[in-house]
UniProtKB/Swiss-Prot annotation:
It comes from Streptomyces avermitilis (strain ATCC 31267 / DSM 46492 / JCM 5070 / NBRC 14893 / NCIMB 12804 / NRRL 8165 / MA-4680). One of its GO terms (cellular component) is plasma membrane. InterPro entries: AAA+_ATPase, ABC_transporter-like_ATP-bd, ABC_transporter-like_CS, ABC_transporter_ATP-bind, P-loop_NTPase. SMART domains: AAA (SM00382). Its EC number is 7.6.2.14. It is a peripheral membrane protein. GO terms for molecular function: ATP binding; ATP hydrolysis activity. Part of the ABC transporter complex SsuABC involved in aliphatic sulfonates import. Responsible for energy coupling to the transport system. It holds the Pfam family ABC_tran. Keywords: ATP-binding, Cell membrane, Membrane, Nucleotide-binding, Translocase, Transport. This is Aliphatic sulfonates import ATP-binding protein SsuB 2. It comes from the Bacteria.
Length: 250
């Protein structure tokens, strides 16, 4: 089995000259990007900057992009959205198993639910779950496919602050156990710094900043050494520290 260091020497995703336009507006402007296998990457940008468009392109959900994009294992890609997208007429385990088959699928589904803290909720209906529990079920659904690439589009954006912190811990623990490549789209600078080892800033359709976060895990929001990274990211986003503090409390 390849070590984590060996994984990082080969790209799971390679984008070359990726371009996407809507009417007369270019959203992605010739993006070149490698995402190494096993790396946790976060993508920041203003609303409308093209973050979700880039994620959809990597996931193979947007067929209007030009340029080239190559995934080493596109059949083992999972996507988690802000909305858990659980089918309300199917029980939790059935939602987790959607698109899977084989004798071992149910066993993998139960194991995935246990791993995200939902053991015993297999027969629950989605409407019986809290927002955090629904996102845990969505993560279990992504895990059961044993993805090499996990794409997460603002997965915690609709959760309260305390639940978000708990989900941050869970996502990082799951990544450390399974080591997929992760591309996390977020608008939250602190979320990116605490979770990711590499943070990209999308600006005017291009990667404006590519920053390595060289701090050990687990990380704390209160770590003063993360302040330098935060300042660089806010500057790249065109936000002052004072503005960032105001936005965090809105």
């Amino acid at each position: 089995m390849a070590t984590h260091t060996e994984q990082l020497t080969r790209p799971a995703v390679r984008l070359q000259g990726l371009t996407r336009s809507f009417a007369d507006r270019t959203v992605l402007d010739g993006i070149d990007l490698d995402l190494p296998a096993g790396q946790f990457t976060a993508l920041l940008g203003h609303s409308g900057s093209g973050k979700s468009t880039l994620l959809r392109a990597v996931a193979g959900l947007d067929h209007e992009v030009t340029g080239s994009g190559q995934l080493t294992a596109p059949e083992r890609v999972s996507v988690v959205f802000q909305d858990s997208r659980l089918l309300p007429w199917r029980r939790v385990l059935d939602n987790v198993l959607l698109g899977t088959d084989g004798k071992e699928a149910a066993e993998r589904g139960r194991a995935a639910l246990a791993e995200v803290g939902l053991a015993g909720r297999e027969r629950a209906w989605p409407g019986e779950l809290s927002g955090g529990e629904a996102q845990r079920a969505a993560l279990a659904r992504s895990l059961v496919r044993e993805p090499e690439l996990l794409l997460a589009d603002e997965p915690f954006g609709a959760l309260d602050a305390l639940t978000r912190i708990r989900m941050h811990t869970l996502l990082r623990e799951l990544w450390e156990r399974h080591r997929p490549s992760v591309l996390l789209v977020t608008h939250d600078v602190d979320e990116a710094i605490v979770l990711a080892d590499r943070v990209l800033v999308l600006e005017r359709g291009r990667i404006g900043l590519d920053l390595t976060i060289d701090r050990p895990h687990p990380r704390s929001y209160r770590d003063p050494l993360l302040g330098e990274y935060r300042e660089r990211l806010l500057t790249a986003l065109g936000v002052t520290e004072h503005q960032g503090a105001q936005e965090d409390h809105q």
